Amino acid sequence: SLAWELTNIGNSVGIFTNGSRVLGLGDIGVLASMPVMEGKAVLYDRFVGISATPVLIDTYDLDTFVETVVHVSKTFGGIHLEDIRVPDCYAIENALMERLKKPVMHDDQHGTATVTLAAIINACKLIGRDLHSSRLGQIGLGAAGSAIARLALAYGVGDVMVTDVSEAAKAPLVEAGATATDLATLLREADIVVATT
């Protein structure tokens, strides 16, 4: 539509949070999370020239959060989810991806996984290791750890081993092709180890 050509919609992202899982700080609430959201907006502007606007949604109710994002989504070309607790972040992301016809990214999953895989690829190049025949061990299967393991599988890492204090956290990754193991075995057998909380 002309709105994408004649307005800033196509060059904008809404950064949505409820402050329920801010890195290193935990559940600090929506207002206290604002400096982190403003920092993300600065990164978008400085590095890629995208206009990003923090949107603080003061609720832990998943339906209210999703409906709020849906109602204001026409304002933005993309949706960036930030610092939302597990498992709520998965449900919110899935609901928005089903309902919106625009990019939806959960930074704590996709952003972290992308930069982690990039670092691993570059490290392997520097030391002459073939990542596709290597064994990667992922310790911790929260939002970031699960996404790192999934992206490593999609990229074609030789074998992805996973472990977590929660046995239930391993099951979806085993379904996706990872090998569940214990911490001692992972540390002994993995060529590359990534640990997340």
Language-model features and meaning:
Residues 18, 83, 106-108, 164, ...:
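Acidic side chains
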Residues 23, 30-45, 100, 110-197:
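Glycine-rich phosphate/diphosphate-binding loop of Rossmann-like nucleotide-binding domains
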Residues 52-53, 105, 160, 181:
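A local structural micro-motif
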Residues 1-104:
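N-terminal ligand-binding/catalytic initiation module
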Residues 59-65, 86-89, 109-113, 168-169, ...:
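Short acidic loop-to-helix transition motifs that present clustered carboxylates
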